[in-house]
């Protein structure tokens, strides 16, 4: 017996605003059922001595230490601005 129905597939497609045909719904139902069957096989694995992880790969931060440094002087930055006003970049208005 299938663990997921064609109606459920059509409902999810409708929620995602996807237009699918009856043939596609049947195909997706079979594919999703196969995925669920495979996932259920994972429940049979003995994980007693396996430590819990949040990632498959050993994840660690490889970034450098964040060290604040002084930025460029305002005058030097603004000399590249096509337009400025009161020490700020002036950009075209986008709201009325």
UniProtKB/Swiss-Prot annotation:
Transferase listed as a keyword: no
Pfam families: GatC
Keywords, ordered alphabetically: ATP-binding, Ligase, Nucleotide-binding, Protein biosynthesis
GO molecular function, one term: glutaminyl-tRNA synthase (glutamine-hydrolyzing) activity
NCBIfam families linked to this entry: gatC
Record text on subunit structure and interactions: Heterotrimer of A, B and C subunits.
Family named by the database record: Belongs to the GatC family.
Primary role: Allows the formation of correctly charged Asn-tRNA(Asn) or Gln-tRNA(Gln) through the transamidation of misacylated Asp-tRNA(Asn) or Glu-tRNA(Gln) in organisms which lack either or both of asparaginyl-tRNA or glutaminyl-tRNA synthetases. The reaction takes place in the presence of glutamine and ATP through an activated phospho-Asp-tRNA(Asn) or phospho-Glu-tRNA(Gln).
Protein name (database record): Aspartyl/glutamyl-tRNA(Asn/Gln) amidotransferase subunit C
The species this protein was found in: Geobacillus kaustophilus (strain HTA426)
Origin organism lineage: Bacteria, Bacillati, Bacillota, Bacilli, Bacillales
Gene: gatC
């Amino acid at each position: 017996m299938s663990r997921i129905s064609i109606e459920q597939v059509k409902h999810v497609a409708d929620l995602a605003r996807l237009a699918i045909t009856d043939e596609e719904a049947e195909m997706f139902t079979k594919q999703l059922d196969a995925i669920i069957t495979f996932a259920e096989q994972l429940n049979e694995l003995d994980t007693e001595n396996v430590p819990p992880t949040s990632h498959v790969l050993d994840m660690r931060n490889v970034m450098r230490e964040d060290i604040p440094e002084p930025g460029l002087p305002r005058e030097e930055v603004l000399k590249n601005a096509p337009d400025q006003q009161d020490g700020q970049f002036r950009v075209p208005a986008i709201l009325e």
